[in-house]
Amino acid sequence: MRHYEIVFMVHPDQSEQVPAMVERYTGLVTENGGTVHRLEDWGRRHLAYPINKIHKAHYVLMNIECSGETLDEIENIFRFNDAIIRSLVVRCKEAITEASPMMKPAEEKPRRREEKSERPRTERNEEAPADAEAN
């Protein structure tokens, strides 16, 4: 059996059905002898660009270990389920169980503005002309 990371986006009008969908997919994996190593519900998030005139979606991440037949069945369900806007399946070398960067608390995530302000202003100004000369 192989390890897979699956992310799928659910139509925002169907957000209340997400727990039932997740239960169905995890049940399908475990019934066929697989395991679910990580399951994260990222909630409703704004999309980078509209998909079919939809600006928000409910995100779910799953890390599973299953056979190819089970994965084909899951992908087939995703393809014919109108509530699922997009899905992505990536094969992994090993099981990933730690929390994803999306689920880490805010204090653990580095802030870009704070990092930028820590550098001296003169250092930032010196880099700009060097970049301009390179072009």
UniProtKB/Swiss-Prot annotation:
Record field: compositional bias (Basic and acidic residues): 105-127
Ribosomal protein among keywords: yes
Record bears the keyword rRNA-binding: yes
Keyword list, A-Z: Ribonucleoprotein, Ribosomal protein, RNA-binding, rRNA-binding
SUPFAM superfamilies the record matches: Ribosomal protein S6 (SSF54995)
PROSITE patterns referenced in this protein's UniProt entry, alphabetically: RIBOSOMAL_S6
One record GO biological process: translation
GO molecular function term, any single one: small ribosomal subunit rRNA binding
Disordered: region residues: 99-135
Record's GO cellular component terms: cytosolic small ribosomal subunit
Described purpose of this protein according to its UniProt entry: Binds together with bS18 to 16S ribosomal RNA.
Similarity comment text for this entry: Belongs to the bacterial ribosomal protein bS6 family.
Protein name (record): Small ribosomal subunit protein bS6
Organism the protein comes from: Chromohalobacter salexigens (strain ATCC BAA-138 / DSM 3043 / CIP 106854 / NCIMB 13768 / 1H11)
Source organism phylogeny: Bacteria, Pseudomonadati, Pseudomonadota, Gammaproteobacteria, Oceanospirillales
Gene assigned in the entry: rpsF
